[in-house]
Each structure stands twice: as C-alpha cells, then as structure tokens.
Amino acid sequence: MKQLYHLTLRHTVLFFKDKGRFLTALITPIVLIVLYMTFLGTVYHDSLDSIVKYFNVSQKTIDAFVNGYLFSSLLAVSCVTVSFCSNMIMVQDKADHKIKDLLIAPVSKTTLALSYFISTLLITMIINITALLACFIVLGTSHFVLPVKDILYCLFDIFLLTLFGASLSSIINYFLITQGQISAVSSVVSAGYGFLCGAYMPISQFTPAVRTFIKFLPGTYGTSLIRNHLLRSLFLKLGTKVPANVMNEIHQNFDTSFKLMGHTVTQSMMYLIMIGTCFLLTLIYIFLNQSKINM
C-alpha cells in the first residue's frame, strides 16, 4: 500500500511539474473555448433564440443555456483528453527505460500498473473539478445557481467520464513505447474526440450515417448525461415558457435526448452504458497487466 501511494504521488507530481505536458492536456479545452468565443457561442445562441423567439424567454436564460452547453462540452472532452495526456507518464517511463528501474525494485507489475491508473484518475479529476467550479461561477453571473442534487450528479458524471477516459487511455497507452507514438496518439485524440462526443458541434448536425455511428460510442452518452444535469434547471425553466413540442425540439437539437434504433435512450440506460463500458475496459486493462504482453 505504501509503494502504491508513493508511485501514484510520483506520477502525479511529474505530470504537474512538466508544464509542456500540462499545456498539451489543455489544448482541446482551449481550442473549444476559442471556437465558442469566436463563432460557436453565437451560432448556438442564435439557434436557441430562433426556436424560442415567439415565447417569453429572457436573453439571460438563453445566455445561461449557451454557457452551460459550453461547459458541459468542455468537461466531457477534458475527462478523456486529459486522461490520455496524464497517462502518458507510463509511456514516457517506457520510452526512457525508467520502467525497468521501477520493476527492479521490490514493486509488483500489478502495483505499478495500478499506480499509473490511479494517478490518471486523480489528475483528471483535479483538473475537471476545477473546471466545474469555474462553470458554476460563470453560471452564477447569469443569476443561475444549480441545485445541490444537480451538482452531485455532475460530480458523478465527471467521475464516470474520467473512469472511462482513464481505462481507455490505459489500454491504448499500454502498447505505446516511443515518443513518436505518444505524439501521434495525443494529436489524434485531441483533434478527434471533440467531434466524436458532440462537443464541437451537435450530433444532430451530422449526416444520418455519422449520427448512427456516434450513437454507438459510449462517450456520447457520458457527454449527454453531464449536459442534462448541468442544464436540467434551465430545461425546467424553459418548460414553463414553451410548449412540449418545442422543448422536444430543443432536446433533439442540443443532444440531450437520443433515439437509437427507434427507441429513446433514457438517462438510466445512459448510466448503464457508461458503467458497463468502464467495467469492461477496466477488466481488459487488468487482463493485459496479468498477461506478459509488452510492459
């Protein structure tokens, strides 16, 4: 237990001490913020405004909705991209042959693998909880405060998405052994995941074939969960101003409600998908570390 603690602490400290790696982890969230500041924020504002323009919905409510949508996208992306970057410590140790030194010490392979996994979870949770606090402050400027229940749901959603990101990155990074591979994977994940989870643009804007494909990806439902809970109070407020058919249009346009193969995917189903995926990915990572592949 003491070895696990010290190894986890080592990986975590190394990540935060390396400013380059830390900034790399934040590239995707920064790009997302820039996109929203330059044009996406206006696009979403105009999109919602066009839907509710015939109803008595204040601009403050629309602004709060757009801000909440931005932060839900940012958090959903960060949980995965930051996980990949923080888990690169494991790959870096292999590339620098430091992992051999660690395994020479009286440390089991399982303990070392677990320390990388826990460190990835810890780093990603720290960064995303900080981002969530910033979200609450920004929403507060719109005189909108989330109920405690929704805050707890958001924290649980972040944990689930972080667990998903940590387990997925651990499996992929397990097979990486060089600096070039690190750079390639980081670039692909940073550039691609935002599109795949519907952070850069709503899934409803894609072609039917792409929409269907994305709906089979578990990260899509993690994004939808945090989006639902971050915006739930605003949905309730909008529900008092607009009819049910308009609310349904808002849910469809902003990816908070999905239909898969003709069936509505409820939030309970979304949780089952996310928990089941995390469990399966964690089992695969455990299996890899029990085998004699690579490490």
Residue ranges of model-derived segments:
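Transmembrane helix segments
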Residues: 35-44, 173-234
